[in-house]
């Protein structure tokens, strides 16, 4: 038995307007297509909102490298240390250990912040979620 192309497409129901039916025939669409390619400029490809974000989440969850650049972090540490004592020197391993612990703290804070946003039935984290997460931690 030969396979035929099914015209029924499963769609996720998100509310809003119902999809419109295609009225034009194949011949009408073929005649309209060449005018678009010859005169118009092709739009650059864009992913749906959220697709790139999900891809980045998967990418960074797989990786183990440091996400904050080393030199800007080192300058920040030296600037903060300058307030306590002048002419302090740091071993490179000390800066690396500080950076590891800072990134671990931030990742853990954002995980708790995300849980606070989900608890409020949202997917976007807000400033108040960070405040709540820190308060629950006792910070």
UniProtKB/Swiss-Prot annotation:
A GO BP annotation: rRNA transcription
PROSITE patterns noted in UniProt: HISTONE_H3_1 (PS00322), HISTONE_H3_2 (PS00959)
N6-methyllysine, modified sites: 5, 12, 21, 26, 30, 42, 85
MF annotations from Gene Ontology: DNA binding; protein heterodimerization activity; structural constituent of chromatin
Residues with N6,N6,N6-trimethyllysine modification: 5, 30, 42, 85
Post-translational modifications: Mono-, di- and trimethylated by the COMPASS complex to form H3K4me1/2/3. H3K4me activates gene expression by regulating transcription elongation and plays a role in telomere length maintenance. H3K4me enrichment correlates with transcription levels, and occurs in a 5' to 3' gradient with H3K4me3 enrichment at the 5'-end of genes, shifting to H3K4me2 and then H3K4me1. Methylated by SET2 to form H3K36me. H3K36me represses gene expression. Methylated by DOT1 to form H3K79me. H3K79me is required for association of SIR proteins with telomeric regions and for telomeric silencing.
Family matches, as InterPro entries: Histone-fold, Histone_H2A/H2B/H3, Histone_H3/CENP-A
Coiled-coil ranges (or none): none
Principal subcellular localization: nucleus
Modified residues (N6,N6-dimethyllysine): 5, 17, 30, 42, 85
One GO CC annotation: nucleosome
Location of this chain's protein in the cell: Nucleus; Chromosome
Residues modified to N6-acetyllysine: 12, 17, 21, 26, 30, 42, 62, 70
Quaternary structure (record): The nucleosome is a histone octamer containing two molecules each of H2A, H2B, H3 and H4 assembled in one H3-H4 heterotetramer and two H2A-H2B heterodimers. The octamer wraps approximately 147 bp of DNA.
Protein name (Swiss-Prot/TrEMBL): Histone H3
Organism, as annotated: Yarrowia lipolytica (strain CLIB 122 / E 150) (Yeast)
Gene encoding the protein: HHT1
